[in-house]
Amino acid sequence: MSAAAGVMKPEYGPSVPRLLAPRWRAASGPAKAAATAAAVALVALLLAAGLTLENAAYSHGGNAPFSFEYRGLYRTTPDRGEYMKAVSRWPDGSLKYEFAVGPLALPRYRDEVSAELALYATGFIRSLREEYPKFSLRAEGKTKINNTLTGYEVAFFTDVEGREMYARDVLLTPPEAHPREGVLVTMLTAPGASSQVGSPLEVGETGVLLRPLKSFAFG
């Protein structure tokens, strides 16, 4: 761009920065700090909003390597023991969706893995009751995730960050004989986040959490 092109034409009047400059110079230190903080927060919000619109993928190695795709979520710091966590929040900052993956370790067993997962779920549900004071079990049982994976689900109501949530945890293992290691998939959806999700059993069956769950694969 030439120098002439960069000059504001007189008929357009002064630029916005030139109009605001006197007020900025006259503003107090705390006012400037507050304005700067607000600008930084706005930029962070816009970046987060942009990231949620992009297709993304996550993969993890180890003895039970896995991968999945997601969209409409942005990665955040996982809780202790988790491999990965991605969330979406309402404009007021409250939790809207969450998809997290952590390790699953099974003891030695002789029966089919489906039977072992059902036994494991007994203690797992007990730990959920201890973790969530407002835990209310909706259902549990075998569930088919996609064409290659079948797991065991625990669907329940609970409160997270002070608000009611629909929750669905899925215990998954690789499709092999007597696996000992797998993953725990944790999914949360706020009531009202999706018109198609009206109970914990529908979490991950439609909407934002459908993609990461249905694209989940071991190997």
Residue ranges and their predicted role:
Residues 1-23:
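N-terminal intrinsically disordered, acidic low-complexity segments at the extreme N-terminus
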Residues 24, 50-72:
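Ser/Thr/Pro/Gly-rich low-complexity linker/stalk segments immediately outside membranes or between
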Residues 25-52:
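Hydrophobic membrane-insertion alpha-helices, especially the h-region
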Residues 55-59, 81-85, 146-156:
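Short, hydrophobic/aromatic-rich segments at coil-to-beta transitions
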Residues 64-123, 157-164:
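Secretory pathway targeting signatures of secreted, lumenal, and periplasmic proteins
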Residues 107-114, 140, 196-203:
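Second-shell loop/turn segments in exported
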Residues 130-138:
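A short, amphipathic edge element
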Residues 145-219:
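Short, well-structured beta-strand
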